[in-house]
From Swiss-Prot:
This is Homoserine kinase. The keyword Metal-binding does not apply. Belongs to the pseudomonas-type ThrB family. GO terms for molecular function: ATP binding; homoserine kinase activity. Pathway: Amino-acid biosynthesis; L-threonine biosynthesis; L-threonine from L-aspartate: step 4/5. It comes from Paraburkholderia xenovorans (strain LB400).
């Protein structure tokens, strides 16, 4: 179970004194988290999630919590951080930063279809546009500078083709990031980790004509300011793939990209570099999974994800993938 920091009833009662959220009805740990300790919290006022941040510091948290509050205020369905009585969005619990956010309706869809991808594509574009006037800035902390720092620590564990691919793709991405076309790509706050287990779906309302309804996006704690196309690529690389092979499913991919473009059409530069950004999205998670696999953190309680999954995806993307109706090449 992914609760790294336990909370007793007296500790919870003392913590809740700082909030105007009613009386506690139920409190239980959530098993799915890998970075933080998460708990479902039901009170007489509603349903929430309490998160104790195991790695993020009090100095780092405002960017993420304020972004979520900003998006929620712009009608993007995301967890809305609840202010304490002093107005702060987090405090210290068990000596660690902790926050309470609203609980999204629904459950993750781990086998998404075309309609799920349409919902995600449209909402991702809405989220990008809603974040344009968010005043704070923080770069994506898992982008090129982190790759350049991390790859040398991973290479000694790899052999042959893996070493060659990890090094050659880093060089390719460095050149891409330095290009004028890359500089021209639209950017702003990005989720940067919008996998299928970071979205909720609820039952659609009768008579709406929709089979599914997006409950919202969550887990914004890898968010940062980056190229919007990178966020799209990360999302497509998870929602639209065959998990066994890493190959893109054409129907889901086209559905998500067309849905996104009904809200925010891609620019010429984005069309031209779609293949490059799919590679960047795959590379980012291959690097992080290799790092977690070969250099696990002290006291890591969970089994790391298989790095081979994103190696397969990267190798698939090297052949080039087109946006709907537009032929693009990685070369």
């Amino acid at each position: 179970m992914a609760v790294f920091t336990a909370v007793t009833e007296p500790q919870l009662a003392e913590w809740m004194r700082h909030y105007d959220l009613g009386d506690v009805v139920e409190f239980r740990g959530i098993s799915s988290g890998i970075e933080n300790s998460n708990f479902f919290l039901t009170t007489t006022r509603g349903e929430y999630v309490l998160t104790i941040f195991e790695k993020l510091t009090a100095e780092q948290l405002p960017f993420y919590l304020d972004l979520m509050r900003h998006l929620a205020a712009h009608r993007v369905p995301v967890p809305d951080p609840m202010p304490r009585e002093d107005g702060a969005l987090f405090g210290l619990l068990q000596g660690k930063p902790a926050a309470i956010v609203t609980r999204l309706e629904g459950a993750p869809e781990l086998a998404p279809g075309v309609e799920h991808c349409i919902e995600v594509g449209q909402m991702l574009a809405r989220m990008h546009l809603a974040g344009r006037d968010y005043p704070a800035y923080q770069p994506n902390l898992r982008s090129l500078p982190w790759w350049k720092e991390t790859v040398p620590t991973i290479l000694p564990f790899l052999e042959g083709g893996q070493r060659e691919l990890l090094s050659s793709e880093l060089a390719y991405q460095e050149a891409f990031f330095a290009s004028a076309d890359y500089a021209a790509l639209p950017e702003g706050p990005c989720h940067a980790d919008l996998f299928r287990d970071n979205a909720m779906f609820a039952h659609a309302e009768p008579g709406t004509g929709h089979e599914v309804r997006l409950g919202g996006f969550f887990d914004f704690y890898f968010a940062g300011c980056d190229k919007w196309l990178f966020d799209v690529a990360v999302t497509v690389n998870d929602w639209c793939v065959d998990l066994a092979t890493g190959k893109l499913d054409a129907a889901r991919t086209e559905a998500m990209l067309r849905a996104y473009q009904t809200v925010r059409p891609f620019t010429a530069e984005e069309n031209r570099h779609w293949g490059d950004m799919l590679r960047a999205g795959a590379y980012r998670f291959w690097v992080s999974r290799l790092y977690d696999f070969h250099l696990p953190r002290a006291a890591e309680l969970l089994k790391p994800h298989d790095p081979g999954h994103f190696e397969r995806i990267l190798r698939e993307r090297l052949s080039g993938v087109a946006l709907p109706g537009i032929h693009t090449s990685c070369n």
